[in-house]
Amino acid sequence: MENVWITTAEIQVQPGDMPSGDTLGFMRVTMWASSHDDLHQKLSAYLAKYQWRLISIDRTAVIDSSFDYGDEVNQMIDETLRDQNAIRLGTYYSYKPS
């Protein structure tokens, strides 16, 4: 059975994809999946369409409908709940490797 999951994804994007020029970053993601591994596989395949690479996922869990995730993520969850094919990407926070 699939549920809506939430994760924090660390992603490598192509040079020039972000205004900062940075190629590493992270974002919150919501999507339907049947397991942690299913989420990882589906998200990797989705990002590959943009030639982006999933580096890691963290804080991955089925959403808790009683928890307030904040305005942006709550909206992402609502949109994901309405569309079982949805993959919602939150704000991308880029960084430079140290």
Regions of interest found by a model, annotated:
Residues E2-I57, A61-S98:
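Long, contiguous binding/interaction regions
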